[in-house]
Amino acid sequence: MRIGNKILVFIVGFCLPAVVLVSYCLGVWFDHRVELLRQDNVRHELANIQQQFRIDVDRLGFLTNIYASPLSHLDSEQLKSLESSWLESSMSGNLSWFILRDGNLQNVFQNEQPIAEANRQEIAKAITTQAKPEFASAYLIGDKGYVVTAVASHLGEYVLLVRQLTERDLLEYAQTSLVARVSMSNVVTAHHSSHSSSVALPSLISQQPIYLHVEFSDDPFRDVKLSLDWVSLAVILLGILIVALGYVWLRACLLQPFKSLMQQLALVDPMASVYRPVTSEGNEELSVLANRVNSLLARIYQQKERGKITLESIAEAVILTDIEAKVIYMNPKAETLLEVASSNAVGESLASLLKAGEQLNQAVFHCIRLGETMPQVAKIKLLTTMPRIIERSISNVLNHEKEIVGTVVVLRDITQEELLKHQLQKRANFDGITGLLNRQAFEEQLPEFASQARSLAVCYLDLEQFKLINDSCGHTAGDRMLAMVARAIQSCLGPQELLARIGGDEFGLVICDRTALAVAQLLKQIIAQVSLQVLHDKNCNYKVGLSIGVAFGRAPYINAQELLKDADIACIAAKAKGTNQIHIYDDKDKELTYQRNAPKWAVRIAQAIEENELLLYYQPIRGLGASSKRQRMEVLLRIQEPCGRILAPAQFIAAAERFKLMPEIDKEVIRKAFLWLSLNSQLWQDHCISINLSGNSLGAEGMVEYIAKQQQIFDIPSQCVCFEITETTAIQNRHRGMEMLRQLRKLGFSFALDDFGSGFASYGYLRELPVDYVKIDGCFVKNLAVNAKDYAIVKSIQDVCRVMGIETVAEFVENQEIIDRLQTIGINYAQGYAIGRPQPLASYCEQFETRLAQRA
């Protein structure tokens, strides 16, 4: 249906009925509002009538109160005078006075309206029953209504004022002309309309209710209500005429310009090579619509041109196909890559252009059939004049209804990228000097290589004298030697072996399914071949040797990575035996087991330091002569496991020294020992503790400053601390150690030379070292009582030290016989199990106080 007919249907079917319906609804609404106004006035008038009645009753009650006392006390003459005055007043019209005395109701004035005797008795009974000092109520006799007010004057007497209410009196209660009639009744008048209502009044007789029945007039509102007359019809006809004129105006001003615009839009071709805008006449809205259409056409043209320029400029080849995989467009790059003109390619199948067989067409059909939203990428070989590796991407083309109408095939020449990737992969996995696998590739291939073997031998090969070549001839010559060694090793291997360069001068070799004897023979052959390699440089000849560590594994318990670690440890043992040696890893070899576990111990030591698991023990040093003024003890170190087990230093000290952890251990021992001294100041006068300093700590940078800072923090006297250094450490770190000892001596600390006699020291070194004590090595002390040579050595050391002013300490004192011999020689102090076993340092004070108490 055309838009003009739609407008006509809208006017006839919607606008005209709407005009009639609105007119009718307005009339109904207005009548409803008038009715609401009438009901509101009725409620207001009822409330007003009730209020006026109460005001009238209150006024009568007030009047009764005024006259009650005089009427009950005046004599007959005075009553006559009062009666004449009352009758002459304007208030006496409908009012009558009565006195209730002895249960009888009597008129006060003779000329007042009489009340029947039965009614009088009923009024008297009601007043007597209520027994109130005053009250006001309504009373109905027949169709006549009265208002009765009573005031008690004496005991049992009441003065009553009775007013008869006529219909005129009742109508005067109303304030508007809305009330037509007011009457009194002792029943509620039933009414089925809202034109009358009833108001309850206080009744003199409780069993006889009295109501004011109010009737309302409908005349004031009848004139304002609307009804369907000729005026309403005229309004409806006028509305219809206006609607008809509006339709004519709409047809001329809107439909005709819109029809012209639609004719122009029907001729628009979005794919036209020339941009032609549409024009509009008539109104601003159609101009906006035309401008929006022109803007859309301009964007379509701009995007079409931009897409065309983009496709012609990009480096990728782009081919558009229809749903049958027939070519409908090719950009210039595709023409160059495929060596075919676009005009010749249109209509051809994609597979025939790329010379890829039906496989490519099937890929296109598969992409269309699945409705893929993501590009489908794959690599193909392009068989042109120069073969190329192409990355092709197929994407579906959708129309506005999300239907697939074709595909876009993007071809990218990745020949150079593939070559570069191959080179990078080779560099990532192979050593550039030897051409062998590097460590990363070796460790990646090792598990797979091991999974296919029944038995496995992992070998760790380390070159000897290779550093000499690098230092003497330079790294270029070293690289040449590495290449020569790699070729020599490869010449001995078959396809079932895996060889790699895993370090500077280190090689890894994996041998599968050979006996230990065959492996040993192969390795000896490799050593022989490597030994034959000679590097000529600067008129010099250089050779290298090999140290080989071997670790064996047998399926199914082959862990290649662990075997490589074991082979590395075995290689260290082979190097220790000399050049061109082979060592096979044996887990029963304690030294190899220690080498293997040393890294774990290093981690455990670092954890113990961090988590405060280092414990201090002490071993007493007893003076053997009367000159010993201070009680001495050596501070020993332990590690407490989380389970509570105590680890002796022999289990971890060697690992700490190998991984340079001793300075941190020494610092923690110093801190804990100084803390213990600071908490036990009662020991400062007569005690001295000995703390061992390792070779790594002797002369270490910052160690003197650390000791000085800890002394300052804990504020302990330096004469309570003696540092022990071993004889070998003092000689190996002679210059740095001497400087450190001098600085600490300035701070007041004393020093002891430990294990004296076990190393290479001479008395000349002893003369140079600023030590206060010499601890004689236990190897000379433990057999002192039965070995004359040991006795002579200990005696000579004691004689020299006495001359030099150095006190001596004998270690490993295990029985009383040794103590006696030491006293004979003149040794100053003794230390060993005969003196006391190591105990926790925290328990020393308690034991010391116990001994003092026992002595006392």
UniProtKB/Swiss-Prot annotation:
Per UniProt, the keywords (alphabetical) are: c-di-GMP, Cell membrane, Hydrolase, Membrane, Transmembrane, Transmembrane helix
Give GO cellular component annotations, separated by semicolons.
Answer: plasma membrane
Judged by the first EC level, this protein's enzyme class is hydrolase
Name the job this protein performs.
Answer: Affects motility and biofilm formation, and is linked to the regulation of sulfate uptake and assimilation.
Organism, scientific name? Shewanella oneidensis (strain ATCC 700550 / JCM 31522 / CIP 106686 / LMG 19005 / NCIMB 14063 / MR-1)
Q: Which GO terms describe its molecular function?
A: cyclic-guanylate-specific phosphodiesterase activity
Task: Domain (EAL): give its ranges.
Answer: 598-852
Asked if the Swiss-Prot or TrEMBL record annotates the protein with the keyword Cell membrane, the reply is yes
Membrane-protein topology: Multi-pass membrane protein
What PANTHER family does its record include?
A: CYCLIC DI-GMP PHOSPHODIESTERASE PDEB, CYCLIC DI-GMP PHOSPHODIESTERASE PDEF
* Regions that span the bilayer: 7-27, 230-250
User: Which GO annotations describe the biological process of this protein?
Assistant: regulation of single-species biofilm formation
Q: Which gene encodes it?
A: pdeB
Q: What is its main location?
A: membrane
- Please name one Pfam family that this protein belongs to: GGDEF
Q: Which compartments is it annotated to reside in?
A: Cell membrane
Protein's name according to its UniProt entry? Cyclic di-GMP phosphodiesterase PdeB
Domain (PAS): residue spans on this chain: 303-350
State whether keyword Protein biosynthesis applies. no
